[in-house]
Amino acid sequence: MGIRKYKPTTPGRRGSSVADFTEITRSTPEKSLVRPLPKKGGRNNTGKITTRHKGGGHKRQYRLIDFRRHDKDGVDARVAEIEYDPNRTARIALLHYVDGTKRYIIAPNKLSQGDFVEAGPNADIKPGNNLPLRNIPVGTVVHAVELRPGGGAKMGRSAGASIQLVAREGRFAQLRLPSGEIRNVDVRCRATVGEVGNAEQSNINWGKAGRMRWKGVRPTVRGVAMNPVDHPHGGGEGKTSGGRNPVNPNGQREGRTRRPNKESDKLIVRRRRTGKNKR
């Protein structure tokens, strides 16, 4: 994948760029693997906004991605197509299994049309193959990693993501996540070999607000720029800093909100670097 830069023909074009989509081999999805995706506009079943800055955007269909693959152990599959997915930053690969089944998976780097992939404990260590962590050599780069055995891939699914298997002790494997955190994961959990493709995604310059609106992202307005009726930070004579701890429009504390005594914290070997310690 590469990045195509636009010439500055208009203010919105100046500096903006777009993916060149050279790896895409098919423009329409497999009909049997798509489902309707109605827009919610960031609202719940009562109509209340639960996620701000969402609304509008282009219509989408949801592509069903196989994040487990355990039911296809030992069954070879050919990569029929590499496709664009509007619901994620990574590309997706359409697999045609020898038993006639069709499935989508996250497309790893260096996987191309016509390649063969497989799943199972005896699969080769090559991009696109899915194995339990106990069968993957230490030092291997993986993606689409399960947190619980059989629970489906939860980590390392976005464009360019890679997780390294750094050690294995007893029933746990130690993984270095993209954030720098090192975490214990059950060796029965499965992972896919290789890093996620489309790594240049993070270098795209969207150029104008309108392109974000096409994606369904609405403007983010600072609370201190609002009136008191709209936000606890609003109002004041002239420019003010808010005068209180950061809160959301409902008055609830914002910022560092991660629970320090989360049950899964015991599996963290080394925390990710944050704030002043991030170097």
From Swiss-Prot:
GO annotation, cellular component aspect: large ribosomal subunit
Comp. bias intervals (Basic residues): 50-59, 269-279
Residues covered by region (Disordered): 1-59, 224-279
GO molecular function, one term: rRNA binding
InterPro entries given in the database record: NA-bd_OB-fold, Rib_uL2_dom2, Ribosomal_uL2, Ribosomal_uL2_bac/org-type, Ribosomal_uL2_C, Ribosomal_uL2_CS, Ribosomal_uL2_dom3, Ribosomal_uL2_RNA-bd_dom
Keywords: Ribonucleoprotein, Ribosomal protein, RNA-binding, rRNA-binding
Keyword field contains RNA-binding: yes
Biased composition (Basic and acidic residues): 253-268
Cross-referenced Pfam families: Ribosomal_L2, Ribosomal_L2_C
SUPFAM superfamilies given in the database record: Nucleic acid-binding proteins (SSF50249), Translation proteins SH3-like domain (SSF50104)
Gene Ontology BP annotations: cytoplasmic translation
Domain of life of the source: Bacteria
Annotated disulfide bonds: none
Quaternary structure and interacting proteins, as annotated: Part of the 50S ribosomal subunit. Forms a bridge to the 30S subunit in the 70S ribosome.
Family: Belongs to the universal ribosomal protein uL2 family.
Protein role: One of the primary rRNA binding proteins. Required for association of the 30S and 50S subunits to form the 70S ribosome, for tRNA binding and peptide bond formation. It has been suggested to have peptidyltransferase activity; this is somewhat controversial. Makes several contacts with the 16S rRNA in the 70S ribosome.
Listed PANTHER family: LARGE RIBOSOMAL SUBUNIT PROTEIN UL2M, RIBOSOMAL PROTEIN L2
Official protein name in the record: Large ribosomal subunit protein uL2
